[in-house]
Amino acid sequence: MRSMKAIIEYLLKQALINLQQSGEMPIDLEIEIKVENAKDPAHGDYATNLALVLAKPCRQAPKVLAERLVAVIPVDPSVEKIEIAGAGFINFFMRSTARSLIISEILNKGKEFGRGNLGQSQKVLIEFVSANPTGPLHVGHGRGAAFGATLGNVLKAAGYDVTLEYYVNDAGRQMNILAVSVWLRYLELAGEPIVFPANGYKGQYVYEIAQEIWSEQGNQFVHPWISVVENLPADEPEGGDKETYIDAIIARAQSLLGKDGFANFHQHALKTVLDDIKDDLQAFGVRFDSWFSEQSLFEDGSIEKGIQALKDRGHTYEREGALWFRATDFGDEKDRVLVRANGQTTYFASDVAYHWNKYDRGFDRVIDIFGADHHGYVTRIKTAVKALGHDESALDVILVQFAILYRGGDRVQMSTRSGSFVTLRELREEVGNDAARYFYVARKPEQHMDFDLDLAKSESSDNPVYYIQYAHARICSVLRQLKERGLKWDKDMGLKNLDLLEQQHEATLISLIARYPEVIQSAAASCEPHQLAYYLRELANGLHSYYNAIQLLCEQEQLRCARLCLLESVRQVLNNGLAILGVSAPESM
């Protein structure tokens, strides 16, 4: 069944064709027909500014064009009347019978209502979170997790074949820093008088990993502290450079422990932290189809293949012993190093190989979701994709601003390396999964987010997730009252008497639930799940207003059954929308 908005768009398109065929309008017009929901019921159900858009190319007054369009719009049984307003807006009033058909559709389709075929089964890969496995996820990662998972659900509902992927950065320098941090805590457990590096990972989890290795493997990896720091450059507190110092201590650890010994700490730390990340995300309702290892790119030769592909296309050159990618040829601000003079590949080389791999797996569209601090990566990734011969328009990079927590009006401080950060797990335990999932996606991803912990825990209409869930619970309560009072709900009778739904609150609710498929399609097309969050709050507001104004379980059986059909339709839409957001729909509160 086509949505009412789709019906109006079709009617306007036919009107345009009619005017073009009669010579009253140019044939070569490239106009996008936009139909919006009317903001005021007095102005109908839907409106379009098509006449205003046509005014310039047609060199005619908008109101004149509106009159011509309305005169040739085909008759449709769904439309009661069409009016011209203001400078040339065209307002559509739908028949109550057309609006009521949506109730029947919702009751028939249930959980499938709202699903469409915008994506036409196109294969989409969404990579998100991808936090370094060097510690627990923090609240900033939580926003990316909620956004990515919800976007995946929205795209699935719109007919895309979606794969969710976490890129595990298990081959980089940060993992080496974690491994050496664990080893130093291990030495501390052995009684060595270590001085922990300024750039090491200081969280409690580092102690716990070290304790586990000590308990399982004993003192076989112990070396005297003096042998660890002998002839090393100074650390930051002693006036040195912390980056230089941590690299030096990593090299010393690799030398003292040997390849297998250092790998023992590396792998133990990786497995422990990654398992914790997986458990955390699972508990948050975020489930990945694929955990892609960066290390696998080295093991299967993908790094070399990606670099060779750029070489073969003439997009590289050597300078000062390093291999460079001609990124400026593709719009980047500067060229990028692929292989350093010491023979080590860069993070960028891994990114090139990873995106080569993504396209090689046959995805029609690739979506990268990065934290806002990765804004510098966007251009370089797109230039690499273009240089490799792939369609850069099939790559979307979405930047998600980190969340800032507030408690009691004061900002909560967090810092990853210092170990004092607020974890996603702590946030979930304080406000619950539902509040976290909703609050994280309630704004555009590029907008800064102030997460009010007190608001998220409040049981009031100011808390949007509580307000929406309470609307669902209220409807369930009405259905329970029905049984308690021994009243009857005959769905067939209700569907036959939907014309009795004459109250303005009822017309508003019917218009709102009819919009749900359009909201899903729009959110999918623009990659903006917040549209659904806004919509559900609007629908909940309509329900609460209806509940407070109307006697729902009235004595008149035909009207009561019709109202219950409407209520069940609203409940189903709330349920469907909340499921996409990853939020529960409680039956009582």
Curated annotation (Swiss-Prot):
InterPro entries: aa-tRNA-synth_I_CS (IPR001412), Arg-tRNA-ligase (IPR001278), Arg-tRNA-synth_N (IPR005148), Arg-tRNA-synth_N_sf (IPR036695), ArgRS_core (IPR035684), DALR_anticod-bd (IPR008909), Rossmann-like_a/b/a_fold (IPR014729), tRNAsynth_Ia_anticodon-bd (IPR009080). A motif ('HIGH' region) lies at residues 131-141. It comes from the Bacteria. Keywords: Aminoacyl-tRNA synthetase, ATP-binding, Cytoplasm, Ligase, Nucleotide-binding, Protein biosynthesis. It is an enzyme of class 6 (ligase). One of its GO terms (molecular function) is arginine-tRNA ligase activity. GO terms for biological process: arginyl-tRNA aminoacylation. It is found in: Cytoplasm. GO terms for cellular component: cytoplasm. HAMAP family: Arg_tRNA_synth. Belongs to the class-I aminoacyl-tRNA synthetase family. Monomer. PANTHER family: ARGININE--TRNA LIGASE, CYTOPLASMIC, ARGINYL-TRNA SYNTHETASE. This is Arginine--tRNA ligase. The gene is argS.
